[in-house]
Amino acid sequence: HPFIVTLATQLIVYGILLMYIMLNGNNGQPLSGLDKSFKNFVTGSFLKIRGVPIPNYVWYACVVVVFMWFMWNKTTFGKNMFAVGSNPEAANVSGVNVMRTTILVHTLAGCMYGITGFIESARIGSNQANTGLNYECDAIAACVIGGVSFVGGTGKISGVVLGVFILRIIFVALQFLAVSQNMQYVIKGLIILIACAIDMRKYLVRK
């Protein structure tokens, strides 16, 4: 399953990176003291709304959303992604190159991970090997809340964006209520389980 392979590869690369840093790097210490221009490129603001500065990374996220929406809805590659996710066998019979589409999807995901790492490093002002660890859980939760199906064939970019907003509002509220980080992990897991259960129920009803 692509998700299992991706998760396993992540753990392998993460472990190798930690060993490399411990043996040949800075003993696992965070990299800080990043150039100010690098941080300002991401955390600075060129536009204010009613006097409130909007960080640049918000606009970068908007650009990515528009790009992905266009690719998903207006290109052949987007249609192929949907077809392969829905039913690889049927997509193959219809003339879609399933292997090529799958590789391109993973390549696109890798590019997005790189962009995210670049932005996150500048946003927090430092970087280390475990920066972004467990972000995949946030991504899964946001997508499932936004209507993306684990079995494929269902999902919209607008739904994912809505899921991100809903998830973020939930965790900001939990922080405001002084809920511990450990309990937030529990709540996040429950959100994913409940959303997946609802998704599977819808799938079984359709079947």
Residues covered by each model-derived region:
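Cytosolic-side transmembrane-helix boundaries in multi-pass membrane proteins
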Residues: 93-100, 170-207
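Loop-to-transmembrane alpha-helix initiation sites
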Residues: 2-4, 54-60, 102, 134-136, ...
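Membrane-helix/interface signature in polytopic inner-membrane proteins
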Residues: 66-106
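Transmembrane helix-bundle core of multi-pass membrane transporters
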Residues: 2-75, 101-104, 127-129
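Transmembrane alpha-helices
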Residues: 4, 63, 92, 97-120
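Transmembrane helix-loop junctions in multipass membrane proteins, especially transporters and channels
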Residues: 22-30, 73, 77, 122-129, ...
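Transmembrane alpha-helical segments in multi-pass inner-membrane proteins
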Residues: 106-107, 113-114, 123-186
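Hydrophobic core segments of alpha-helical transmembrane domains in multi-pass membrane transport
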Residues: 10-18, 60-70, 106-116, 143-149, ...
